[in-house]
Amino acid sequence: MNLSDLSSQPYQSFGGFGVDVAIKRTDDLDKRMLEHLKSKNKPKVLDLGSGAGGQSVRMVEVGASVLAIDIYDFSEEFTEHQMNGNWSQDDLMFVTADLVNLPKILSDKKFDDALMQRTLHYLPYDQADDLLVFLRKTVEDKLFISVTGMDSAVGENYSGKNLPIANRFVRLEPAEADIFQIQAPVCLYKKEEFIALLKQTGWEVEDVWQSAFGNLKAVCK
């Protein structure tokens, strides 16, 4: 099933990690990433928590070389993307992996930019901290990142709401888990906590905002 076929389907979830928004549409963070990449000459980009590759494909189309990584195996979808676009592994490559293992996967490789949409909240806070520290050493220009916010609909009945962020990693109530198609435990963020995490891991926050849905987005360098 190619990207146009996927985008014509209802919102889908793969592996209980929420719906794959990127195969349906671009949001404001996706669009800012694409505009940023258009000014570059074949930038090397990481797409972390790529899902079925909606944004990965768009980034290749504007000239980027993309390495997409997701814990769910989207190898078949990415093989189709490569065939449909007549792209090589250098243009678009997919790896199935848990992001906690990213340092082992990438070793000393460097990338120009990285995108991590709707993904960081699936890691406990200490692992999120470690990942962002590693990315600061690996990404030479900008990080475009979003998380599910405490003020989102997901956070309304979130049982970890009053826990310190270091211990805030819990599953949603069964009804909410089914509604949002999120079966994995999550660490939801308040805006000030998200900003603090980015800064303490070495990132300069150029812009940060809360979406109409209560999710948090940032552009960092």
Explain the meaning of each model-derived region:
Residues 118-119:
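Short catalytic micro-motifs in class I SAM-dependent methyltransferases
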